[in-house]
Amino acid sequence: MDWMPLVLAAEEAESRGFSLNLNLLETNIINIAIVFGLLIFLARGYFGRVLGERKSEIENGIREVENRGRQAEQELATARQNLSQAQVQAQQILASARTNAERVRAQVLDQAQIDIARVRETVDQDLRNEQQRILTQVRLKVVGDALARLRERLPGELDEATQRRLLDRSIQLLD
């Protein structure tokens, strides 16, 4: 390449000062336009395809996110419904447990009252039996003591009729 014309042109420009070169061929505007035109013409298909693929990926991503959002909303609604059902069921279980507890409490109290009455009756019966036994022992002791004193005091003085009267009276006292 010959640099000489460029050097001469630069020297001439320096001698004239600063100026605007309006020669289109010298300024390479046409060359740049041709390069850009070819670049656009050749790269348009490639960039169109790349941008189309990118647009398609973005649209698919948006659809997928929207689907996930709808699915999450459905799962949330299902979870809320399940929670509501669980709360209702828990309330029913608590109410049932309270009812059962009250019923069992009433049964236990009733059974306790029955048991207390039965124990009292048994204690009263045992007390009456013990009183009767003690009373019988006391009567026997009194009769035995009375007979012993009579035997000491009246040896040979009692006839058979008097002994019979004493025995009958002693038997009446026992009843």
Curated annotation (Swiss-Prot):
The chain crosses the membrane at residues 22-42. Pfam families: ATP-synt_B (PF00430). GO terms for cellular component: plasma membrane; proton-transporting ATP synthase complex. F-type ATPases have 2 components, F(1) - the catalytic core - and F(0) - the membrane proton channel. F(1) has five subunits: alpha(3), beta(3), gamma(1), delta(1), epsilon(1). F(0) has four main subunits: a(1), b(1), b'(1) and c(10-14). The alpha and beta chains form an alternating ring which encloses part of the gamma chain. F(1) is attached to F(0) by a central stalk formed by the gamma and epsilon chains, while a peripheral stalk is formed by the delta, b and b' chains. F(1)F(0) ATP synthase produces ATP from ADP in the presence of a proton or sodium gradient. F-type ATPases consist of two structural domains, F(1) containing the extramembraneous catalytic core and F(0) containing the membrane proton channel, linked together by a central stalk and a peripheral stalk. During catalysis, ATP synthesis in the catalytic domain of F(1) is coupled via a rotary mechanism of the central stalk subunits to proton translocation. Component of the F(0) channel, it forms part of the peripheral stalk, linking F(1) to F(0). Keywords: ATP synthesis, Cell inner membrane, Cell membrane, CF(0), Hydrogen ion transport, Ion transport, Membrane, Transmembrane, Transmembrane helix, Transport. The keyword RNA-binding does not apply. It is a single-pass membrane protein. Belongs to the ATPase B chain family. Its main location: membrane. The keyword DNA repair does not apply. It comes from the Bacteria. SUPFAM superfamilies: F1F0 ATP synthase subunit B, membrane domain (SSF81573). InterPro entries: ATP_synth_B-like_membr_sf (IPR028987), ATP_synth_b/b'su_bac/chlpt (IPR002146). This is ATP synthase subunit b. HAMAP family: ATP_synth_b_bprime (MF_01398). One of its GO terms (molecular function) is proton-transporting ATP synthase activity, rotational mechanism. It is found in: Cell inner membrane.
